[in-house]
């Protein structure tokens, strides 16, 4: 299994599938279809059926049940796109067998050191797949894709392992928050699902942020600075005044665990026009609403000083804490936990400081916790993944489907 997941990850990683948050199409980039077509053919080759790929880039497939028991239909999902944060063009994965715990020379100018990334010490003796230091790797989430396909292939080759009906989905645009926007839950037809989109060994996540995006626009009046007194209105100054109303401690670089934040993601401005882009995140729904109210109050304060038309604020909720929808069917988390424990994996059930496709899918009627895929240092040139962790993730999938079958009547 180890060599299969390595081969698949490296092959998938070389296909550029970066999404684009400025695009209004689905998928946001046509090149995501380059991998989707490869995966569609591969699913057919290994023996899955009912394979569909729609015009929006959603690839579904089925492994039919091989038991007479009434087992829930279980789905496994991963996304094909890579982040907009770092280039995914010309990815050249490097294989490092039997890692010795020392520095890793990614290229002649770049070293990945345990001094900077101490978690490397967890992987001594293992096979690591790294970047060449010029791109991301794309283990987020091509490791998840490799694990799901390898697990399905293993189940097909070992029919003595009993399971209910299984559904597979590979989806676009997760990295820009639009993965489930055109996901047809009814057509997918699963009772429960799991995303294989987590990080290190043992991650099992069923709580995510509540999330919103905020755009603030300020409008000023440009006048020659030599004659600007009582005439110029500076949009940049207004934008700064708004930002100064934001909490200084509730920011990503100062928070962890269940602590939420207001994050200024982007700023651009001139005298006449300035824009601020924020994301708001909190696991607690009440605190989430309070953060949005704080921003509305800051906007009202600036408007009172400069005029109502001088500032506009748009707040759009993006997704909610999936824990609210998973808690009533907590047994799906318990089964994943038991699957890990049977494989001597210690489950790590920390809240996701982010969101997955499962965050939205859970609110669309498909409860979907998140399981580790193995990636470390994702979204950058120091990204890597352990082949042994990918193999374990594949085994977790196989254990989960067996446990569902064993519990059924």
UniProtKB/Swiss-Prot annotation:
Q: Which UniProt keywords apply?
A: Aminopeptidase, Cytoplasm, Hydrolase, Metal-binding, Metalloprotease, Protease, Zinc
Obligatory cofactor(s): Zn(2+)
**According to its UniProt record, which reaction does this protein catalyse?**
Release of the N-terminal residue from a tripeptide
Outline what the protein does. Answer: Cleaves the N-terminal amino acid of tripeptides.
- What does the record give under GO molecular function? metallopeptidase activity; tripeptide aminopeptidase activity; zinc ion binding
Enzymatic class: hydrolase
NCBIfam families from the UniProt entry:
peptidase-T, PRK05469.1, PRK13381.1
Give the SUPFAM superfamilies listed for this entry: Bacterial exopeptidase dimerisation domain, Zn-dependent exopeptidases
In Pfam terms, one family for this protein is M20_dimer
Q: Which GO terms describe its biological process?
A: peptide catabolic process; proteolysis
Family statement: Belongs to the peptidase M20B family.
EC number(s) reported in the record: 3.4.11.4
Q: Where does Zn(2+) 2 bind?
A: 140, 175, 379
UniProt-listed PROSITE patterns: ARGE_DAPE_CPG2_1, ARGE_DAPE_CPG2_2
Question: Entry's InterPro entries?
Answer: ArgE/DapE_CS (IPR001261), Bact_exopeptidase_dim_dom (IPR036264), Peptidase_M20 (IPR002933), Peptidase_M20_dimer (IPR011650), Peptidase_M20B (IPR010161)
One Gene Ontology cellular component annotation held by this UniProt entry = cytosol
Annotated residues for binding of Zn(2+) 1: 79, 140, 197
Cofactor binding description: Binds 2 Zn(2+) ions per subunit.
Catalytic residue list: 81, 174 (proton acceptor)
| Localization terms from the record | Cytoplasm
Question: What is the name attached to this protein's record?
Answer: Peptidase T
